[in-house]
């Protein structure tokens, strides 16, 4: 049977009528919708992290492992995300709303010495879950039905080490281990046919790469400071196993395949699943009072097998700006003077393009960090809140516009767990 392949996103109306869509319809392609976005506080500042060194002693920066000179406490962070997506298409003026919640970050970090800091963490890296059913009446009078299904999650476990070479300059190294499975299938049938033609791709991921980081912070007059940073993430050094099967069959009991006849079967191993990334950033601020920074991220496009065919991701970049403001961390008479207020925005030229149209993204962000009231600001456990309002995609060329409101919450427990005081 000759394969009839149609990218489901091109038919926006069909996709919006889908029975199940993941957090974004664009997750149907490649390894899914990338969820990796670091911690709640960094997300609330537009994602600036490369030149971000927190002024206090209770936070570890995993995005740039070199930017951790002030960490003095053991910190345990547990964070969750709630995503609210609103999809719209000009095709019959259709709209769909989707919600999801998930555990987005678990990390622990502590100082080994005054110069060496270490952290470990878990985050989901990407995910997909979609079901798309399209029907088309052909000129012959027969009906062609295509079912697209996909699901899976890729997660990452990280270990990061920071070394302060001088009071102003530091280096860092982070190892990233990726694991998980991603599955896609396209099933095609006709009203006058007994068999279904299925094109199935399974990607098994068990791979790793490394991120190198540098950070430089110069103290200036009047408690001002200048911070510079850069990171470089190597492309994947492990392998992704991909199996592809083109076969015909029919179902019994709705799930069991019978009379399976394999037309084509392929197996491959690729090293280019996780792309090379590069980031530079700069920031300026006043000690324990305020900070503002900007950042440029670049990600190299890679090719991945999608339903038996190579799917090319374009090179992408992201421009971010943001910062924080703390009114008075020593004012214990006014609690909200000790709350940290965060703000930011970003624009991302995405790695997907359809009909010559790039799928880009823009968002504004904000958030607050609430210290536990019975702690001093220099030894601060607390709760982080973040919000992100933005848009992805476009209504042009029969595509889909995705508006989103994402809410993040995290709890940071910070204390000298391994070096308790003898007297309180």
Regions found by a protein language model. Give the residues of each.
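Subset of outer-membrane beta-barrel
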Residues: 19-424
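Bacterial Sec-dependent N-terminal signal peptides
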Residues: 1-24, 424
């Amino acid at each position: 049977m000759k394969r009839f392949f149609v990218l489901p996103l091109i038919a926006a109306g069909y996709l919006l009528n889908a029975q199940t869509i993941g957090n974004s319809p664009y997750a149907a392609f490649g390894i899914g919708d990338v969820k990796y976005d670091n911690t709640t506080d960094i997300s609330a500042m537009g994602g600036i992290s490369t030149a971000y060194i927190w002024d206090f002693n209770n936070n570890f920066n995993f995005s740039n492992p070199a930017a951790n000179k002030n960490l003095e406490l053991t910190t345990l962070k547990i964070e969750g995300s709630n995503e609210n997506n609103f999809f719209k298409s000009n095709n019959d003026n259709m709209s769909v709303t989707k919600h999801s919640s998930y555990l987005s970050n678990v990390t622990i970090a502590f100082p080994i010495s005054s110069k060496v800091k270490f952290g470990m963490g878990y985050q989901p890296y990407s995910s997909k879950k979609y079901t798309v059913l399209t029907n088309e009446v052909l000129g012959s009078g027969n009906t062609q039905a295509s079912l697209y299904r996909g699901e899976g999650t890729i997660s990452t476990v990280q270990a990061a080490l920071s070394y302060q070479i001088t009071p102003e300059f530091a280096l860092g190294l982070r190892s990233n281990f990726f694991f998980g499975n991603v599955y896609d299938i396209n099933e095609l049938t006709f009203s006058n046919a007994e068999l279904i033609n299925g094109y199935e791709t399974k990607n098994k991921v068990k791979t790793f790469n490394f991120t190198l980081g540098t950070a430089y912070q110069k103290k200036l007059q009047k408690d001002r400071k200048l911070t510079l940073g850069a990171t470089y993430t190597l492309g994947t050094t492990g392998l992704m196993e991909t199996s592809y099967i083109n076969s015909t069959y029919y179902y019994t009991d709705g799930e069991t395949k019978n009379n399976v006849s394999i037309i084509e079967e392929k197996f491959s191993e690729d090293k280019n699943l996780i792309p090379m990334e590069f980031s530079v950033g700069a920031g300026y601020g006043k000690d324990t009072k305020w900070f503002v920074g900007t950042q440029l991220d670049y990600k190299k496009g890679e090719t991945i097998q999608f339903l038996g065919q190579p799917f090319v991701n374009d090179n992408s970049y992201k421009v971010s700006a943001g910062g924080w403001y703390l009114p008075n961390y020593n004012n214990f008479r006014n609690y909200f003077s000790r709350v940290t207020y965060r703000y930011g925005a970003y624009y991302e030229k995405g790695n997907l393009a359809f009909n010559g149209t790039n799928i880009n993204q823009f968002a504004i962000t904000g958030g607050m960090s609430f210290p536990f009231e019975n702690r001093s600001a220099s030894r601060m456990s607390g709760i982080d809140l973040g919000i992100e309002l933005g848009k992805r995609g476009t209504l042009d060329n029969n595509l889909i516009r995705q508006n989103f409101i994402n809410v993040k919450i995290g709890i940071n427990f910070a204390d000298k767990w391994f070096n308790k005081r003898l007297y309180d």
